[in-house]
């Protein structure tokens, strides 16, 4: 069982769960499949945390021909409280099982949590700095060349989020 009677990423002793890679895959696909079952056509999906970081990969590769998601934009929030350690080395094979293109997976030859974010950023349309982040994340974002919102220090973040979201939403005349 991936989630029952568990903490988010590690046990009470701080040891990472060995199946975090599978949990992330299950979580990302579960979100998308739930959206499909509810017959929603989202304009925007906002991804938070490492566990959802594979959602952009699945949305843009596995579900890329689904008309329900053809105009969906993805924003990812980056936090500096990322996990140390690695995912299961077999994560690439698990993703290939879903016919995810190898070109999007090569970075996972080194299956770190930072590299999960690299994949997420490369396939996202925007990013929000949800906290003061590490310099290597800033470099990742510069390479991705996507819009950025830095809102971790502003108390009026609701308006900033809404204004940022507006950049990605379709014009409704």
Where do the protein language model's features map onto the residues?
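Catalytic cores of nucleotide-sugar-dependent glycosyltransferases that transfer UDP/GDP/TDP-activated
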Residues: 1-173
């Amino acid at each position: 069982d991936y989630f029952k009677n568990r903490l988010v990423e590690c046990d009470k002793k701080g040891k990472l769960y060995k199946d975090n890679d599978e949990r992330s895959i299950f979580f990302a696909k579960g979100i998308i499949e739930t959206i499909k079952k509810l017959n929603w056509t989202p304009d925007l999906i906002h991804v938070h945390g490492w566990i959802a970081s594979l959602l952009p990969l699945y949305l843009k590769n596995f579900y890329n021909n689904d008309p329900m998601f053809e105009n969906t934009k993805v924003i990812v929030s980056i936090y500096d409280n990322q996990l140390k350690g690695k995912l299961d080395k077999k994560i690439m094979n698990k993703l290939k099982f879903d016919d995810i293109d190898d070109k999007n997976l090569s970075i996972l030859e080194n299956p770190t949590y930072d590299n999960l974010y690299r994949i997420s950023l490369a396939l996202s349309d925007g990013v929000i700095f949800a906290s003061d982040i590490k310099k290597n994340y800033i470099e990742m974002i510069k390479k991705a060349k996507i819009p950025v919102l830095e809102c971790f220090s502003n108390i009026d973040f609701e308006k900033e989020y809404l204004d940022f979201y507006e950049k990605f939403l379709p014009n409704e005349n």
